[in-house]
Amino acid sequence: MTAILERRETESLWGRFCNWITSTENRLYIGWFGVLMIPTLLTATSVFIIAFIAAPPVDIDGIREPVSGSLLYGNNIISGAIIPTSAAIGLHFYPIWEAASVDEWLYNGGPYELIVLHFLLGVACYMGREWELSFRLGMRPWIAVAYSAPVAAATAVFLIYPIGQGSFSDGMPLGISGTFNFMIVFQAEHNILMHPFHMLGVAGVFGGSLFSAMHGSLVTSSLIRETTENESANEGYRFGQEEETYNIVAAHGYFGRLIFQYASFNNSRSLHFFLAAWPVVGIWFTALGISTMAFNLNGFNFNQSVVDSQGRVINTWADIINRANLGMEVMHERNAHNFPLDLAAVEAPSTNG
């Protein structure tokens, strides 16, 4: 009798690490994108929490007038924010080691740049991780495509807009009131409400909410009865069951009679594609709008576009919005400018006769 002994090569440490990283059996999938996502998002989150609680005031306008944003310096949850990096830094890469001291780094708003850049890397990797997990499971890639809309929006306000305006100080502050301030100033300087891409974004968000509510209520109203009156209707569903849990024909018939026949989907797949695509495309357009307005390709200007036969201006809603824009513009960064940009751009009249 002859025994044949086969020497099995033990898998290398690197091979086991690769298998663990890409395993779909882990409770939470890591993936190669996760290797970068986890440290960047942890860094952004940690610095955000510390800075929101304890960061000293930041000289956002670069004029030696620091603005307080943290809780320990007098703010609450509503008014608090991570103040954007100083206009004195502009678009320069400003890590801690570029400052003369940590105090200088904090005074110039270094935490904002650190948080934003790590956050954008992290959410981009999260999107890649969605694609990676879909690929491993043999799924189609549209989850990552849908997530690209909020990623594009965040990239627009935190990176593209500061690049276009020439300074991270023009980025969106990381806080509730700071976000509202960003929106108001954006309207004042770019007339975003009159930009078609913003209008498409509004239609996408509000339309998506409407369609989500319509779909959820139609499905909930046409569930196939599996329970008694004394049980929750939710008990009639078992995870993984093969049968439909609602009657799409009944839902189609109801909605087709409520509006008209062709307003109602008769294909569940095309319906769900529509529910995903509508808000995603709208938010894509808004991100594109922010990115074009970053370089001052602004919303429509219909100011004083209606005049009577004598040449006198008949005010329209556009003129009311323009007046509001001017009011908002003269109030923001009030000590940084003598005049708002669009008023200072007009040639001054001669004073020497």
Curated annotation (Swiss-Prot):
Binding site for [CaMn4O5] cluster: 170, 189, 332-333, 342, 344
Reactions accelerated catalytically: 2 a plastoquinone + 4 hnu + 2 H2O = 2 a plastoquinol + O2
Enzyme Commission number: 1.10.3.9
SUPFAM superfamilies referenced in this protein's UniProt entry, alphabetically: Bacterial photosystem II reaction centre, L and M subunits (SSF81483)
Transmembrane segments: 29-46, 118-133, 142-156, 197-218, 274-288
Further comment found in the protein's record: 2 of the reaction center chlorophylls (ChlD1 and ChlD2) are entirely coordinated by water. Herbicides such as atrazine, BNT, diuron or ioxynil bind in the Q(B) binding site and block subsequent electron transfer.
PROSITE patterns: REACTION_CENTER
Membrane topology: Multi-pass membrane protein
KW rRNA-binding (keyword) present: no
Co-factor note (free text): The D1/D2 heterodimer binds P680, chlorophylls that are the primary electron donor of PSII, and subsequent electron acceptors. It shares a non-heme iron and each subunit binds pheophytin, quinone, additional chlorophylls, carotenoids and lipids. D1 provides most of the ligands for the Mn4-Ca-O5 cluster of the oxygen-evolving complex (OEC). There is also a Cl(-1) ion associated with D1 and D2, which is required for oxygen evolution. The PSII complex binds additional chlorophylls, carotenoids and specific lipids.
Positions that bind chlorophyll a ChlzD1: 118
EC class name: oxidoreductase
Domain of life, per lineage: Eukaryota
Binding site for a quinone: 215, 264-265
Marked site (Cleavage) residue numbers: 344-345
Chain residues that bind Fe cation: 215, 272
InterPro entries documented for this protein: D1/D2, Photo_II_D1/D2_sf, Photo_RC_L/M, Photo_RC_L/M_CS, PSII_D1
Posttranslational mods: Tyr-161 forms a radical intermediate that is referred to as redox-active TyrZ, YZ or Y-Z. C-terminally processed by CTPA; processing is essential to allow assembly of the oxygen-evolving complex and thus photosynthetic growth.
Site (Tyrosine radical intermediate): 161
Role: Photosystem II (PSII) is a light-driven water:plastoquinone oxidoreductase that uses light energy to abstract electrons from H(2)O, generating O(2) and a proton gradient subsequently used for ATP formation. It consists of a core antenna complex that captures photons, and an electron transfer chain that converts photonic excitation into a charge separation. The D1/D2 (PsbA/PsbD) reaction center heterodimer binds P680, the primary electron donor of PSII as well as several subsequent electron acceptors.
Subcellular location: Plastid, Chloroplast thylakoid membrane
Subunit structure: PSII is composed of 1 copy each of membrane proteins PsbA, PsbB, PsbC, PsbD, PsbE, PsbF, PsbH, PsbI, PsbJ, PsbK, PsbL, PsbM, PsbT, PsbX, PsbY, PsbZ, Psb30/Ycf12, at least 3 peripheral proteins of the oxygen-evolving complex and a large number of cofactors. It forms dimeric complexes.
Keywords annotated in UniProt: Acetylation, Calcium, Chlorophyll, Chloroplast, Chromophore, Electron transport, Herbicide resistance, Iron, Magnesium, Manganese, Membrane, Metal-binding, Oxidoreductase, Phosphoprotein, Photosynthesis, Photosystem II, Plastid, Thylakoid, Transmembrane, Transmembrane helix, Transport
Chain positions recorded as pheophytin a binding sites: 126
Family under the similarity heading: Belongs to the reaction center PufL/M/PsbA/D family.
Protein name: Photosystem II protein D1
